[in-house]
């Protein structure tokens, strides 16, 4: 199944991050907490402005982003993988290498 977001929505695949405890033990999965970083896997066409024009999004497929994991971010399972559906405004930053 494929998924295509509408308007200013994006689909993000959460990236797992490795954390260490105060004692140096590597924490993974639920012990490490949920990451607020992810990879953009699909983008909508853009935000519709009041005058009817479409403003393209600043993010693109493949971007690694830091996002606000709060109200308005929807978690869905697509092909047995968790993805997040959010508005571009829920993205706080693009991580540049």
From Swiss-Prot:
A GO cellular-component term linked to this record: cytoplasm
InterPro entries: Chaperonin_GroES (IPR020818), Chaperonin_GroES_sf (IPR037124), Chaprnonin_Cpn10_CS (IPR018369), GroES-like_sf (IPR011032)
Disulphide bridges: none
Chaperone is among the record's keywords: yes
One Pfam family cited in the UniProt record for this chain: Cpn10
Keywords: Chaperone, Cytoplasm
Gene Ontology biological process terms in this record: chaperone cofactor-dependent protein refolding
Subcellular location: Cytoplasm
CDD domains: cpn10 (cd00320)
Transmembrane helix recorded as keyword: no
Top-level taxon in the UniProt lineage: Bacteria
GO molecular function: ATP binding; metal ion binding; protein folding chaperone; protein-folding chaperone binding; unfolded protein binding
Alphabetical list of PANTHER family matching this protein: 10 KDA HEAT SHOCK PROTEIN (PTHR10772), CO-CHAPERONIN GROES (PTHR10772:SF58)
Quaternary context: Heptamer of 7 subunits arranged in a ring. Interacts with the chaperonin GroEL.
Protein family according to the UniProt entry: Belongs to the GroES chaperonin family.
Main function: Together with the chaperonin GroEL, plays an essential role in assisting protein folding. The GroEL-GroES system forms a nano-cage that allows encapsulation of the non-native substrate proteins and provides a physical environment optimized to promote and accelerate protein folding. GroES binds to the apical surface of the GroEL ring, thereby capping the opening of the GroEL channel.
Protein's name in the database: Co-chaperonin GroES
Gene this protein is translated from: groES
